[in-house]
Amino acid sequence: GFYVWDIESLDDPRIKAKAKKLEGNPLPVKEIKSRLAKARAAGWEMIYERHTADVRKYMDRCHIDLGGVSPNLTTKDLLRGMDISSPALRYLEELYFQYGRYLMVGSSRPGTLPAGLQGKWNNIRCAPWTGAYWANVNVQMNYWPVFNCNLAELVSPYYDLWNANFKEKQRIAKEYLKEITGKDVDDVWMSGTENSAY
């Protein structure tokens, strides 16, 4: 399991229940190794074709044309010699728009966790902002373009995360408001700034 402590010795029943729920989940190493072996067996070209076909279903839903002209330069060289009025700049803006969409397509699919502040690609053990889902507009900003870009289903992981935690957030809000006002309030909820999927 994920835990090294003895679940039965936990004092808080809420933590105990959550730990028990997750205790049976195996570490993903075995599954990851299996998927990597299948990918190696399929080969680069097959993986690339499959990926391209999958992503194209989403990317073909929205187009942008700012009159950009694709120069025969790397992005780094393009940025280095940028002329504010050049068609190459408009190309770079188009590329940036498409790259943002590509990252969303790759990091938020129905049935998965939502895109975090580092998407799905964080390679740092102690990620900036703890790799959490921050409820102070940071994570929400990831999802601002999905509706305008005809990618509405990609927001479902974000909704799923918040809906799964709604009852607990409502309970915390009731306790907090009772503590500071002395009143029972039923139609409230709150979220801490930092939130974890676990």
Residue ranges and their predicted role:
Residues 136-147:
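Well-ordered alpha-helical segments within folded domains of soluble proteins
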Residues 130, 145-149, 175-181:
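Bulky hydrophobic/aromatic packing residues
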Residues 1-133, 151-174:
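Acidic/polar, glycine-enriched structural segments that form the non-catalytic walls/loops
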Residues 171-198:
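Active-site-adjacent "gating/activation" loops or surface patches in catalytic cores
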